[in-house]
Amino acid sequence: VTTPQEVALLDSRKSIGFAESLKVPIIGVVENMSGYTLRGKGASGSVFSVLGPGGKDIDVTVSDDGSWAVTLDIFKSGGGASTAEKTGVPFLGALPFDPGVVRGGDDGVHRIIAEPEGESAKAFSAVVEKIEDFVSQDQDSDGLEII
């Protein structure tokens, strides 16, 4: 699990190299805190601009039902997928930055349980499915290897 910043990705690449040197199977890379989605309501069809990270203007259009959403890459994005590709390990997915996960932990009700159809729950579920697929595969293993 990594965050999208270069210093975290460097640590992840080192960890992958270390695991490979010990012949420890690597399930894959997960990018955590990958984008923060702001949501709101406005006049249907209106367009406004949000000042994103790095001073980048992001145009947002309000949908017919009056809702809008914009995802800001606060900590960058795509680094997990790029690291997985460069190191030849599977990319398991990206988990959004969600303050509700922290609040849920403090309140004793995990965000995934409280909001099973939410963005975070769907992202976690997609990652978990890939991990389950990996674990359920018949691994050709001769047991432990002394190195």
For the regions a protein language model found, what residue spans apply to each?
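C-terminal lobe/tail of nucleotide-utilizing enzymes
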Residues: 16-147
